[in-house]
Regions:
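C-terminal structural segments of small proteins and small subunits
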Residues: 70, 78-94
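A generic structural signal for ordered secondary structure
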Residues: 60-63, 85
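Short S/T/G/P-rich N-terminal loop/turn motif that feeds into the first structured element of a domain
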Residues: 1-57, 64-74, 97-104
Length: 104
């Protein structure tokens, strides 16, 4: 029997309208991200949209469990950080479970 640890992710698509205020959010979100075991996989680096639409910044965080990912988003610490983001950007955020099925 194969035991696999399927990871869980936040995928955030963000358009930043106020970079200085967004930096305050990026500083504030470190507290809940650390508390819930988040690890940045992408954080607004180089990208090229090859099909469809995305916002200008894509952030992917990995969490140790789906429950941890949701708990982080719903935490009072993240709620405080989110208030800083809301005035500085528009974001679409999804919590996703990794895939452990058959691969090509």
């Amino acid at each position: 029997m194969r035991v696999v640890d399927v990871q869980r992710y936040w995928v955030a698509n963000v358009d930043i309208s106020n970079p200085d205020e967004y930096k305050k959010y990026a500083t504030a979100n470190a507290v809940p991200f650390r508390k819930y075991g988040a690890k940045f996989l992408t954080r607004g680096g180089k990208s090229e949209m090859v099909e469809g639409k995305l916002r200008s910044r894509v952030v992917v965080l990995e969490f140790p469990s789906f429950e941890a990912a949701l708990a982080c988003y719903r935490s009072p610490e993240y709620a405080a950080a989110k208030k800083l983001r809301e005035g500085a950007s528009v974001a679409d955020i999804a919590v996703l479970e990794g895939y452990d099925g058959q691969q090509p």
